[in-house]
Amino acid sequence: MSGNHNQSLERALEIVDLAAEAGADALKIQTYTADTMTIDKNDGEFFIEDKKSLWKGESLYSLYQKAYTPWEWHQAIFQRCKEKGIIGFSTPFDFSSVDFLEELDVPFYKIASFENVDLPLIKKVAQTGKPIIASTGMASLAELGELVSTARENGCMDLTLLKCTSSY
């Protein structure tokens, strides 16, 4: 779903309904806040100046504020998924989001491309004992090896790697 809900819970639930009607087996959301992703700064590496970018003139912080799925919506979204017969799950971006998702008893986790080298996060997720789907992104073969060994050494025996594009 990503930020396609445009900060509307009604729209988020409609996306779940439409995904189910279209025959989807699962629906993934992302669990983070602007504060857990970056700092509130409007210059340097935290500000988008690329003239070709859709987000030119935006700070990363403001983009994350616009795109995040409010944590208080997660339960309603996952409940709607259950009602519609599809699996709701999420991509965590930090320890607090893993802890929160564990409270909601998500069935498995997705690791984003840019987090596939965050070995402390991989370890934390693997220690839940739940399956992990990890995007390969731009990771090297050595980095993917570290991801796999970290996941396995910390309890994840059901690991799927997805080849994906990291630049759109």
Task: Go through each PLM region and give its residues.
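Active-site beta->alpha loop and helix N-cap motifs at the rims of alpha/beta catalytic domains
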Residues: 51-119, 141
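Catalytic domains of carbohydrate-active enzymes, especially glycoside hydrolases
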Residues: 14-33, 104-105
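Catalytic alpha/beta core domains of metabolic enzymes, predominantly
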Residues: 139-168
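Glycine-rich, proline-tolerant flexible connector loops at the mouths of alpha/beta enzymes
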Residues: 7, 25-68
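Short, small-residue-enriched loops and turns at beta-alpha junctions
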Residues: 4-5, 34-38, 66-67, 116-117, ...
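Conserved, mostly hydrophobic/aromatic
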Residues: 19, 101, 135, 161
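Short, well-ordered coil/turn segments that N-cap beta-strands
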Residues: 23-25, 82-88, 105-107, 128-130, ...
